[in-house]
C-alpha cells in the first residue's frame, strides 16, 4: 500500500468481499485504502493451525468454497487450490431397531442409489432425488452466471430460467411444499431441507421464503451446487485475495 493523504476509495473491512473490491478497483487505476481493525485480513474466511507441532491449516469459520465465480479467480490471478468432497452427507438413523443411514456419495451414483434402497426398501425416493436435483441443476446453470452481471429484474430472471414449475417451487412458494410433494420419507425430506435452514430461523413453510433464499445460494454455486474444500483452509483464499490487492497497488 502506498501512503497518501487522499484516496479515491476507502474500504472499511478486509474480509473477502472487501479484498475483491480492493483488487478490482486498484487494477482499474484507483488509489485504494483498506482499513481492517484486526491484525490480519480475511474476516470470517481465515485459517488456523489448531494442532501444536503439526503444519496443518484448517478453516476456522467459513470452510467451503462454492459461490466464488471462476471469472474472479482468473481476473485477479488467484493462486489457490480446492478439492472435491467425495461424500456430500451421511445421515444416521435407526429403523426397526436396527442402525442404518443415508449416504449421499458425490463420487458414486451406485453407492448413493444403494443407500436409498437400503433405507427405504425401494428406488422410488432415489428417482425423486434425481428428478429434484436435476431441476436445481438446471436453475443453477442459469442463475449462477448472473453473479458477475448487472442484477436482473425478477421478470428477467424468470425468463432466463425458462421453467415455470421450477420458478414456482423455488422462488414463489414455500420450499417445504415442493419437498413434501417430491419425497415421502421424512429423513430424506430433512436432508434436502438442511440447505434451506442453515443459519436461518425459518421453517419449511415460512411465508417469508427465507428458507428458499438460503436453499438457492446453497445449490447454485459454480452452476453445479458443489461446495469444495480449500487446500490450506479458507485463509489460503483470502491470503491470495490480499496478495492480489497489494500487487495491484491497494
Go through the PLM ranges and name each one:
Residues 35-37, 210-217:
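Active-site-adjacent bridging/hinge elements
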Residues 1-3, 26-33, 236, 242-250:
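Secondary-structure transition/capping motifs at alpha-helix termini
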Residues 38-41, 204-210:
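Short glycine-enriched loops at secondary-structure junctions
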Residues 19, 35, 106, 169, ...:
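Conserved structured core elements
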Amino acid at each position: 500500500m502506498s501512503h497518501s493523504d487522499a484516496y479515491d476509495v476507502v474500504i472499511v473491512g478486509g474480509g473477502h468481499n472487501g479484498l475483491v473490491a480492493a483488487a478490482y478497483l486498484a487494477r482499474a487505476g484507483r488509489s485504494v485504502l483498506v482499513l481492517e481493525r484486526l491484525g490480519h485480513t480475511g474476516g470470517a474466511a481465515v485459517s488456523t493451525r489448531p494442532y501444536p507441532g503439526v503444519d496443518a491449516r484448517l478453516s476456522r469459520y467459513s470452510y467451503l468454497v462454492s459461490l466464488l465465480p471462476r471469472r474472479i479467480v482468473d481476473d485477479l490471478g488467484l493462486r489457490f487450490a480446492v478439492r472435491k468432497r467425495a461424500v456430500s452427507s451421511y445421515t444416521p438413523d435407526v429403523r426397526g431397531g436396527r442402525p442404518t443411514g443415508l449416504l449421499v456419495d458425490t463420487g458414486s451414483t451406485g453407492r448413493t442409489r444403494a443407500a436409498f434402497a437400503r433405507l427405504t426398501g425401494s428406488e422410488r425416493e432415489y428417482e425423486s432425488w434425481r428428478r429434484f436435483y436435476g431441476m436445481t441443476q438446471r436453475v443453477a446453470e442459469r442463475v449462477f452466471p448472473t453473479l458477475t452481471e448487472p442484477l436482473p429484474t425478477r421478470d428477467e430472471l424468470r425468463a432466463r430460467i425458462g421453467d415455470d414449475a421450477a420458478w414456482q417451487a423455488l422462488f414463489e412458494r414455500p420450499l417445504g411444499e415442493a419437498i413434501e410433494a417430491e419425497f415421502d420419507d421424512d429423513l430424506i425430506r430433512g436432508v434436502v431441507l438442511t440447505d434451506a435452514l442453515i443459519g436461518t430461523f425459518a421453517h419449511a413453510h415460512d411465508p417469508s421464503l427465507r428458507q428458499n433464499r438460503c436453499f438457492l445460494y446453497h445449490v447454485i454455486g459454480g452452476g453445479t451446487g458443489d461446495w469444495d474444500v480449500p487446500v490450506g483452509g479458507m485463509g489460503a483464499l483470502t491470503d491470495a485475495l490480499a496478495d492480489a490487492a497489494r500487487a495491484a497497488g491497494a
